[in-house]
């Protein structure tokens, strides 16, 4: 089996060297931890020293193997190293010195992605989890869509469930506005009728997202704190209580706190001020771009929990297709340098 040494090279200020693969190479234009193939008889450290001298004219002092990963039939030894010298580009098209957390801004080669993530999410470890409600914690959309349809029918509109769902994935207000304008309806009346229909949705009609209850409990047991950040009213707490999840939350904000709606950062900033949360230890998790944008604008990490499969291009630092995928990211074994 082919074996490769990849260098986690750190300089005195704590920043780590990453390099961008050049045109014509496999995984061109993606970032990597520099290194190369081990030759017969070489140790991982010896290989790394040779490769970094050849590729970057960079002398290093090597240390321990941080971890070994197998990707596509190749073993990658990630070797810790230190340097006080300046690298020179010879094969790569770019390089950067970054903090572990800054690695989340870069797209890495498949072999390097997990290692970069394990370092980035523990610099420092995440402790505070801010949750959207509708479509994130609870699968409320089927009931909400039917509430919109019933409200629209009072004005003679007959939107399809598919169209309402598509519009709601942007924002409820956007959905109501689009339906009213497109059908000559009264927007404010439609919104008011929807709210009345929504208020009548019984808790037993709302399901927890698959594996979400276990995820909340696991993060809590690992020392995490949960906070609600939702456009829904105080009934969100009632639904959480019904599902036995209310006690897992330290607090949060709802529509009834009368703060500007996401993607404005105000709701998140209010929670952070109220509970004294550190931005570097906080992440906003939601299922729509307005949630992740609110997180970015508030200066915290964001995770797109895209169970609908609609937002794969969202610029959130983390992307998960389902709750299990999300937990694989949030609970990955930390890589300590």
Identify the residue ranges that each predicted region occupies.
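Conserved N-terminal beta-strand and adjoining loop/helix that marks the start
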Residues: 1-16
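Conserved Nudix-box catalytic region and its N-terminal flanking loop in Nudix hydrolases
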Residues: 15-55
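Unchanged
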Residues: 38-122
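Non-catalytic pre-domain segments flanking phosphatase-related domains
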Residues: 118-131, 336-337
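N-terminal helical cap/lid subdomain that shapes the substrate entry/recognition surface
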Residues: 126-213
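Asp-based, Mg2+/Mn2+-dependent phosphohydrolase catalytic module
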Residues: 127, 217-220, 233, 238-337
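Conserved phosphate-coupling serine/threonine residues in phosphotransfer and NTP-handling enzymes
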Residues: 136, 229-230
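Short, acidic loop-to-helix structural element flanking the phosphoryl-transfer center
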Residues: 200-228, 265
């Amino acid at each position: 089996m082919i074996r490769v040494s990849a260098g986690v090279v750190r300089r005195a200020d704590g920043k780590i060297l990453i390099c961008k693969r050049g045109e014509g190479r496999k995984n061109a234009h993606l970032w990597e931890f520099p290194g190369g193939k081990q030759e017969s008889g070489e140790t991982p450290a010896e290989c790394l020293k040779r490769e970094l001298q050849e590729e970057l004219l960079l002398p290093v002092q090597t240390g321990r193997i941080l971890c070994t990963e197998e990707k596509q039939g190749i073993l990658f030894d990630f070797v810790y190293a230190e340097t006080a010298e300046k690298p020179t580009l010879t094969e790569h098209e770019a390089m950067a010195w970054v903090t572990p957390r800054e690695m989340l801004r870069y797209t890495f080669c498949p072999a390097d992605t997990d290692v970069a993530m394990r370092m980035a999410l523990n610099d420092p470890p995440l402790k505070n989890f801010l949750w959207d409600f509708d479509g994130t914690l609870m699968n409320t959309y089927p009931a909400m869509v039917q509430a919109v349809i019933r409200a629209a029918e009072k004005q003679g509109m007959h939107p399809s469930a598919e169209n309402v769902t598509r519009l709601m994935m942007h924002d409820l207000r956007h959905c109501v506005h689009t339906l009213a304008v497109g059908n000559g309806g009264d927007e404010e009346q439609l919104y008011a009728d929807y709210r009345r229909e929504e208020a009548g949705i019984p808790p037993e009609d709302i399901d927890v997202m698959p594996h979400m209850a276990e995820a909340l409990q696991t993060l809590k047991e690992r020392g995490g704190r949960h906070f609600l950040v939702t456009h829904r009213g105080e009934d969100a707490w009632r639904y959480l209580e019904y599902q036995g999840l209310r006690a897992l939350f330290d607090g949060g904000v709802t529509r009834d706190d009368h703060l500007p709606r996401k993607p404005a950062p105000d709701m998140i900033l209010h929670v952070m001020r109220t509970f004294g949360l550190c931005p570097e230890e906080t992440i906003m998790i939601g299922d729509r771009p307005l949630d992740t944008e609110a997180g970015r604008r508030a200066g915290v990490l964001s995770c797109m929990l895209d169970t609908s499969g609609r937002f794969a291009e969202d610029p959130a630092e983390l992307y998960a297709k389902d709750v299990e995928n999300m937990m694989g990211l949030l609970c990955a074994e930390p890589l300590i340098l």
